Amino acid sequence: MNITAIIPARFASTRFPGKALADIAGKPMVQHVYERTARARLVSEVVVATDDDRIAQAVRGFGGRVEMTSRDHETGTDRLAEVASRIGAEIIVNVQGDEPLIEPAMIDEAIAPLAENPAVRMGTLKSRIRTLHDFLSPNVVKVVTDLEGYALYFSRSPLPFFRDKWNDLKDESFASGRLLCYKHVGLYVYRRDFLMEFAKMPPTALELAEKLEQLRALENGCRIRVVETAHESIGVDTPNDLEKVLEKLK
């Protein structure tokens, strides 16, 4: 089975321009993501998708494969679909280009349900929420799943609402495991044919309200398999996030 991981990488970024090329221990960030992704056991090939010549040159410089894409894409999924349309992979993995500490095992965990069950068309990850701050933060996307591990909903709001415990919530409630709730980890796996369908679907009401593209799949009746991971990663959205990554690598 051909499983290709695609890393969308843009130079433009509102909060951290050029972050894909930010230096981390002598390598650009995109190289760290590429090399860690290539170590995933189930991944056959890794490709960087970009519309920027500087990023393309950097990727070629470390021997990576790069595919140039249109500058007109509104979402990362559109960029992903453009590259997927050119390659013969059966399964496409979308690895965020700003996750330089991503664990290869996380990628394998997300792929496994699609590799094992042809009925699964889309998959992603979740991890335990361990602080009250994360539970309440709109920047931490929450997910709830059914008993078979399929997503019921994703939201920036606290989810679920613990009606009887709301006034007593504190960090210890989450750290101890007494309250089990989960944050979404933004790594996606698609069957190629579904990705091509998904990219053509118009934005949906809940997607636009929450600014969460995966809700488009749910609103169109696609079941999303969500696997719990014990691994953690750090997304680099700001220079401050980069400092956290550098601290971890010391």
Swiss-Prot record:
Gene Ontology MF, one: 3-deoxy-manno-octulosonate cytidylyltransferase activity
Protein's cellular compartments: Cytoplasm
Principal subcellular localisation of the protein: cytoplasm
Pathway assigned to this chain's UniProt record: Nucleotide-sugar biosynthesis; CMP-3-deoxy-D-manno-octulosonate biosynthesis; CMP-3-deoxy-D-manno-octulosonate from 3-deoxy-D-manno-octulosonate and CTP: step 1/1; Bacterial outer membrane biogenesis; lipopolysaccharide biosynthesis
Transcription recorded as keyword: no
InterPro entries: Cytidylyl_trans (IPR003329), KdsB (IPR004528), Nucleotide-diphossugar_trans (IPR029044)
GO BP annotation list: CMP-keto-3-deoxy-D-manno-octulosonic acid biosynthetic process; lipopolysaccharide biosynthetic process
Keyword Nucleotidyltransferase recorded: yes
CDD domains the UniProt entry points to: CMP-KDO-Synthetase (cd02517)
One Pfam match: CTP_transf_3
Signal peptide: none
Reaction catalysis annotation: 3-deoxy-alpha-D-manno-oct-2-ulosonate + CTP = CMP-3-deoxy-beta-D-manno-octulosonate + diphosphate
NCBIfam families according to UniProt: kdsB, PRK05450.1-3, PRK05450.1-5, PRK13368.1
Function noted in UniProt: Activates KDO (a required 8-carbon sugar) for incorporation into bacterial lipopolysaccharide in Gram-negative bacteria.
Family the UniProt entry places it in: Belongs to the KdsB family.
Stated name of the protein: 3-deoxy-manno-octulosonate cytidylyltransferase
